[in-house]
Every structure is written in structure tokens, then in C-alpha cells.
């Protein structure tokens, strides 16, 4: 069983995710006809995208599968393949490897006769396939209780000024989300008006690690403004902030968990 993907799509995905992590987890859901690409960045941060299985991304198996892919290694070896190649990705869980292979065929003139000429490439990369990530992707789509917009440069500039702190307090007031430094001396406050608002938010306050917010620096090359929403589960528990980005036509989700 292997995953076959056109090299331009593969390059697009591994280039994006390698900005944040050396490896990702690939979860193929045959019934839903999609694959999930997931990475955990530390600091209670998860990043994932959902890719439909189609002619550009094809899986020939009949059962769901999960494997790990070393995106940084893959990115660095894609120059070995033809620019029009379709790359097959096969995981070997017993030997902790993943293999990329492709056969590219062209017609060449040989004594005035067109004959096929094939070039084969196979690259085996080591990665721990015993690790597994349990992540409920649908949990963060269940319920939204607020939305706002973050200007990335301004947010990063704000947290640069408060690097001596470990976390920010998050609270809500008068249709605004407030980021506040702890304590009463040298207090820094940043407020964001909310495009969607629930009055019950005023009953809550949380913490978020500055370490987590600093992870957003990886988006600085491609994102000016982040749309974000505050998500809760079906039981009404507020979970954290969900940011949105794109890789071409694919939506990317970045989730930061709140701390009580």
C-alpha cells in the first residue's frame, strides 16, 4: 500500500510544514477519502491540514493507515525526481523507514524508432514509525464562541517587548479580547475588537504561553493577518485559539490551547 502524490503538491506541503517541524504524521482516512497531515510544535500547539484524495493525491489501500514522514529530509531530496514525477510514498513500520520512489518514462528516438526510456529513483529515509499521535481533528470544528483578527507583525512586536514574562493573561470585556501581562508593575495590555462575540466570554479568563505565541514567527514570511476563532467543545468547555492559513487550496489549522 502506498500514497502517490504529484511532486508539485508534495513539494508544496513539505516546504510548508518543514518551516515548523522536521517530521509530520500522515493519517489516511479511506472512508472519508481524505488524508490529514499533522505536527505538534510543543507549547500546546498543533498544526494540521486536510487533503482530499483525488487524482493528485492517490492512495491504493483499502484500510486506514498512519505513518510518520520526515518532511525536512523529503524537502531536501525532491530535486532527485523529475519535475513532472508522481512520487510513491511507502512506510515500513518494522524497519522505521519511509521510501519515496518514482519511475519517469519518456520516448526517445533510436534509429528512427521511438522507444520508451524509463528512469527510476528510490530513496529510503529513516524515521521512527513507532511514535503515534492521537488527535481528534473534528473536535476543533464543533463550536465557535468568538472571532477576531491578529496582525502578525504587531502581535510579534508586542510579545518581543515582554520576553521576560512566561505567559499572558487572556480575558474578555466589552466585545474585546485582551492580552495582559501578569502583575501590577510594567503592565502591558493589547486589545482586539471581536468580529463575533458571546457575552458569556466575560465570565472566563485564561493564560497562554508566550513560548506558544512565538511559534507564529514561522508564518511571518507568508501571513500578514490571521483570522482566528475561540473554540469550545460540545460540553461548552473553551479550548483555545484556532488560527487559519492556506497552502494553495488547502486550509491549514493552527491550534493553541488555553491554560486555566
Curated annotation (Swiss-Prot):
What the entry lists under InterPro entries is as follows: Pox_TAP (IPR005022)
Keyword terms: Activator, Transcription, Transcription regulation
Presence of the UniProt keyword Transcription in the record: yes
What GO biological process term is on the record, naming one? regulation of DNA-templated transcription
Q: Cytoplasm as a keyword?
A: no
Q: How does it assemble?
A: Interacts with the late transcription factors VLTF-2 and VLTF-3. Interacts with the late transcription elongation factor H5/VLTF-4. Interacts with itself.
Q: What does this protein do?
A: Associates with RNA polymerase to initiate transcription from late gene promoters.
Instruction: Give the protein's recorded name.
Output: Late transcription factor 1
What organism is this sequence from? Fowlpox virus (strain NVSL)
Taxon lineage? Viruses, Varidnaviria, Bamfordvirae, Nucleocytoviricota, Pokkesviricetes
